[in-house]
Amino acid sequence: MKLTRKMVLSRAKASELHNVRKLNCWGSQLTDISICREMPSLEVITLSVNSVSTLEPVRSCRRLSELYLRRNRIPSLNELFYLKDLPHLRVLWLAENPCCGTSPHLYRMTVLRNLPHLQKLDNQAVTEEELTRALMEGDEITAAPHREGAGNGCPKPPYALNSVSSATETSQHLLSYTEETEVQGQTTTDQSPSFSPRDTMRSHKNRNILTAILLLLRELDTEGLETVQQTVGSRLQALHRPEPQEDME
């Protein structure tokens, strides 16, 4: 099913697409969200429990801060390429998609390496330690995924809430929907006060420097690594050395 202008305006209670800031399309059997290209003011969108297979339309939503895509058909983490230029994206829920693969650790590290500005991934807070590890343990995505044809996915949604679904499965969907909406409320009202603009800028600068250092370390031989180790040790000792206190007489 295609997300249409009429559906968007009705759900968002808006008169024009460019005015839409929040949109909830949870469990709507959607396969095509190309209309997102016409919503530059969009800040929060819920697309969980659908059959969306590409993130390309979302790349036009430059103000997007929260993206909920749990239980869709995102095939590959290469789709993250379309999110890398969204400067305000802080919350992403991508769990239960084919792109998550069989290694939860590699999945999380790869997402965080490519989207280091995230503060929450799959309803779990992102830590500075994770961001540092992601530089070494995550895969870097540098190109858009190759696509055959221009379709937005198969017409038969795997997670549609239809008559075939069992009562248990439906109740689980509804419970997860309630949980997801609660999370949205929390992130809207409490945007991690520990991240001040100055702290965020300093953190990004440190991460960029660390990335460069880690990449250069791969090129060093044993002798070079030993030199780096000695230099780092001396630097740490200097930083931890207590400053001399002046005598107060």
UniProtKB/Swiss-Prot annotation:
Region (Disordered): 146-203
Keywords for this protein: Cell projection, Cilium biogenesis/degradation, Cytoplasm, Cytoskeleton, DNA damage, Leucine-rich repeat, Mitochondrion, Repeat
Keyword flag Mitochondrion: yes
Entry comment describing in which tissues the protein is expressed: Expressed in the retina.
Record localization: Cell projection, Cilium; Cytoplasm, Cytoskeleton, Cilium basal body; Mitochondrion; Cell projection, Cilium, Photoreceptor outer segment
GO cellular component: ciliary basal body; cytoplasm; cytosol; Golgi apparatus; mitochondrion; nucleoplasm; photoreceptor cell cilium; photoreceptor connecting cilium
Compositionally biased tracts (Polar residues): 162-175
Residue intervals of the LRRCT domain: 97-137
Induction description: Up-regulated during cartilage differentiation.
Function of the molecule: Plays a role in cilia formation and/or maintenance. Plays a role in the regulation of cell morphology and cytoskeletal organization. Involved in DNA damage repair.
The protein's name in its UniProt record: Cilia- and flagella-associated protein 410
Source organism: Mus musculus (Mouse)
